């Protein structure tokens, strides 16, 4: 179970408010991998997070199980559906529209994977899908690499949040490219960065300093 973590920010930084929605916590949690909805609810309450990601494909594969979604809504948290499993921009756009219909939110964590082994995001497919979704009124949270130029293109397209990986999904290797993440922070100072993959322990976030 991978939990995205935001890069530390100076105490003088503006509040975390993706797409103008103020959030008291910078922590986001995934909704998969818990042994029961009750345990998920306990984890969400203990974490103090305000945003929970959910995979639409996983939900549909499980017969449309709504218990985790009900837990999120009962706690008054923000739901962030994702397009995990998509390999093309077209797939991701279609799944995002399904998620908006099903969950009633225009927030979408955009995932377009370009490599089956590392699950590295496809920068071209991600940009294509982000551009289309932003045009359709979505608030896009793109899963991306730490490449400055690719990230800048996403911001230029209208993305107000970036979710660069720390390491390959599920690897637990922590922040492999701290310099690249610091460069993103320095060159895109107004854009919230949420480290989205590869973290195996909370202590690993301590390697990144702004």
Where are these regions (language model features)?
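Alpha/beta enzyme core
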Residues: 13-18, 32-54, 63-79, 86-207
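N-terminal amphipathic alpha-helix/helix-capping segment at the start of soluble metabolic enzymes
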Residues: 1-30, 67
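N-terminal start-of-chain detector that recognizes signal peptides
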Residues: 24-27, 81, 165-166
């Amino acid at each position: 179970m991978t939990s995205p973590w935001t890069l530390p920010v100076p105490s003088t930084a503006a509040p975390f408010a993706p797409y103008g929605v103020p959030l008291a916590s910078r922590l986001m949690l995934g909704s998969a991998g818990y042994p029961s909805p009750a345990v998920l609810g306990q984890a969400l309450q203990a974490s103090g997070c305000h945003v929970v990601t959910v995979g639409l494909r996983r939900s549909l594969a499980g017969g449309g199980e709504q218990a985790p979604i009900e837990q999120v809504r009962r706690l008054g948290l923000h739901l962030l559906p994702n397009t995990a499993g998509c390999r093309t921009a077209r797939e991701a756009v279609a799944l995002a529209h399904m998620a908006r219909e099903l969950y009633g939110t225009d927030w979408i964590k955009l995932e377009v994977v370009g490599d089956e082994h590392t699950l590295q995001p496809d920068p071209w497919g991600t940009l294509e899908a982000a551009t289309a979704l932003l045009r359709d009124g979505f608030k896009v949270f793109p899963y991306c690499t730490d490449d400055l130029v690719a990230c800048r293109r996403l911001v230029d397209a209208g993305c107000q949040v970036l979710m660069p990986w720390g390491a390959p999904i599920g690897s637990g290797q922590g922040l492999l490219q701290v310099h690249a993440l610091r460069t993103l922070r320095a060159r895109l100072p107004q854009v919230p960065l949420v480290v989205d993959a590869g973290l195996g322990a909370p202590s690993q976030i301590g390697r990144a300093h702004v």
